[in-house]
Amino acid sequence: MSVRQNRFFLRVLTCLGIACVVPPGAGKPGPALAAAVPASHANVALQRIGVAPNHRGFLRIPSRRPFYPWGFNYGNHGRLIEDFWDTHWSTVVRDFHNMRELGANVVRVHLQYGKFMLAPDKPNPISFKLLSRLLRLAEKDRLYLDLTGLACYRVSDIPKWYNAMNDRQRRKAQENFWRDIAATCAGSHAVFCYDLINEPVVPGSRRKPGQWQPKSSFGGYDFLQFITLNPGRTRRTEVAVQWINAMTRAIRSRDKQTLITVGLLPWIPKWGWLSGFVPRIIGPHVSFISIHIYPRTGKLNQAMEVLRRCAVGKPVVIEETFPLSCSAAEEQKFLLASRTTACGWLGHYDGLTLQDYRKLSREHRLTIGEAIYRSFEQMFVKLKPDFVRRQPARH
């Protein structure tokens, strides 16, 4: 089973409530996890995040204090935020508070194109109003947002007119999306970065009209997306750079400062996807490198090889990681080893806290998926002191 299928499998298990045999005491946190995170925080305004002068990390501006992204990709019981934020805003408020209490300083939110655009040049006012509300919530909880856009994870949420577009039309529509997002967010320091698209791919040859997804879906979701159907004779890496530059120009027309990145698939043949987005080539065109790495049992060396390929003179953030294809101990080993290259780390949150998992375990109702989420949250709390360091910024 592939890493991508494992991710879907986890969601299916969680949603279906398939039980696992997990003794109530299994995975019980030790003393390091028992310490409660402070329930309240000083009312200090968020500062803008920028790249450190040595290009190896991030700084808060203007204080120049170092900033280490440490947080979660946000979901709630397998749902996307647009599935419930208009009708159950209190769930978003609770989850953001809980992620902060677990020690997060960054939350990655995936914005579905079809929920934000009613037409190629017509934004959905309801979704943009909710995005503004999300910015205010993040500012209140002092959580930074990794806003990942152009998401087309569910076929049912993709407008037919969007998939019917040719390359030129679709790129223009994507530029409109990012221009509107940037115009909404430019005044808020709560935005850590704009992630232009999740796991983009440049095809090696011409694709049929409408085939913007690579048919890698499982359980109704597809996290990959082609950025062109007809690369022609242009090198795949050049197509990637041209696309990044087009989206960046759209953003910079409204927001001159917020960091920009792209959520990358691993760029080694052993991992099955050669996307055309090569870190050393796109590096000069983004603020930092974002990579998605799910270590595999017995193959930590491959995960580290992926990470080393990202060391191209820009900060490196592991934007997605989780013990899907390995044990929690192996995931922890990878995270600790990754500090030689990475300066930011985001796992996954799905709506429950350690207290919730303990209750489910006592009641013998903990599912396989929930047990995996619990193991990651335990690790997340335990490792934070080693990852969110306090030393002065390096110049």
Report each predicted region and the residues it spans.
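Bacterial N-terminal signal peptides that target proteins for export
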Residues: 2-13
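Bacterial N-terminal signal peptides
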Residues: 11-23
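Signal peptide processing junction and immediate N-terminal pro/mature segment
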Residues: 23-36
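Active-site mouth of glycoside hydrolases
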Residues: 43-288, 298, 321, 325-326, ...
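P-loop/Walker A phosphate-binding loop and immediately adjacent motor/lid segment at beta-alpha junctions
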Residues: 257, 301-324
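Short beta-strand-loop-alpha-helix junction that forms the active-site gateway
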Residues: 294
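Substrate-binding cleft of secreted/luminal carbohydrate-active enzymes
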Residues: 315-395
